[in-house]
């Protein structure tokens, strides 16, 4: 288990992380979300042992993070962090040695992963000669080269085409099923919802939401209703508790403040007749995020 307990980090007088706590269990994919500057990168660096917390503790399987423990951690950064003048093989040996892997172990694992991703022919090519998408593949391969207990993924699908996104998704699920703890951070909320049963949203270094996604959605009172019926927009906007109506080509999306408004909306719609659709949906994670941090996550 990864345990982050009451962690605070100052840079001088600036508090980058403020009393942050969460756990990631074996085989769990945990979402850590926040806008740029929220404190995610600082948190990742503390988990990696690159920075020491000013206050609090971080442990992996009960051991305080140190150089020995970080051998069991893999990290895919949002930014390219490859040494572009090295070949893929040289880069893998360099990275694997940092994780105390032996050269024959590194090359065996590298050959397996290159073959799995269909890029074996790039083994002796320099990083700078590869496309951005293939560089991202290599960066991902290096992050999982040591079969990490803990894997941190920061925007893992950046620069990938849809086919390779699916390959990465399959690999992430496989790693989780094999017991890896995964911290997943992305601007793409649909990806977070796909992978993460548990998450935290941080703002200015402080947790604003933390828990299981299912529970978070249930506690978030606003809902969306999708309606197809013989009804006009103004009939819906004047219902108490309706906070927004979006008119689409053949249906209305009605936003309400809580579940109690559902029956009111249904009564009005039913009286108008010809109801072919009335579906109540939970809010998306993106809607919840926007309500908490005040801006779109993907902007």
Regions found by a protein language model. Name each.
Residues 88, 213, 282-285:
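Structural motif detector for alpha-helix initiation sites
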Residues 93, 190, 214, 267, ...:
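Active-site phosphate/pyrophosphate- and oxyanion-stabilizing loops and adjacent acidic/basic residues
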């Amino acid at each position: 288990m990864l345990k982050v307990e009451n962690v605070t980090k100052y840079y001088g007088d600036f508090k980058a992380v403020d009393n942050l706590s969460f756990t990631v269990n074996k085989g769990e994919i945990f979402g850590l979300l926040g806008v740029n500057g929220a404190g995610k990168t600082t948190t990742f660096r503390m988990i990696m042992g690159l920075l020491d917390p000013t206050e609090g503790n971080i442990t992996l399987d009960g051991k305080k993070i140190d150089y020995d423990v970080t051998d069991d951690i893999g990290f895919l950064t949002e930014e390219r962090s490859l040494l572009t003048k090295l070949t893929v093989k040289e880069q893998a040996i360099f990275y694997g040695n940092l994780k105390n892997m032996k050269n024959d172990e590194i090359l065996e694992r590298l050959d397996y992963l290159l073959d799995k991703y269909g890029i074996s022919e790039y083994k002796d090519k320099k990083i700078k000669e590869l496309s951005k998408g293939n560089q991202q593949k290599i960066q991902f391969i290096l992050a999982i080269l040591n079969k990490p207990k803990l894997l941190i993924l920061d925007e893992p699908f950046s620069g990938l085409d849809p086919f390779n996104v699916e390959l990465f998704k399959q690999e992430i699920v496989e790693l989780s099923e094999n017991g890896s703890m995964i911290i997943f951070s992305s601007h793409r909320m649909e990806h977070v919802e796909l992978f993460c049963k548990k998450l935290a949203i941080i703002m200015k270094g402080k947790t604003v939401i933390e828990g299981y996604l299912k529970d978070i959605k249930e506690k978030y009172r606003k809902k969306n209703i999708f309606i197809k019926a013989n009804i006009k927009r103004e009939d819906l906007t004047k219902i108490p508790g309706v906070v927004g109506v979006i008119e689409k080509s053949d249906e209305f999306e009605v936003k309400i403040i809580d579940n109690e408004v559902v029956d009111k909306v249904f009564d009005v719609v039913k009286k108008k007749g010809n109801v072919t659709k009335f579906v109540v949906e939970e809010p998306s994670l993106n809607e919840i995020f926007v309500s908490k941090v005040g801006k779109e996550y993907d902007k």
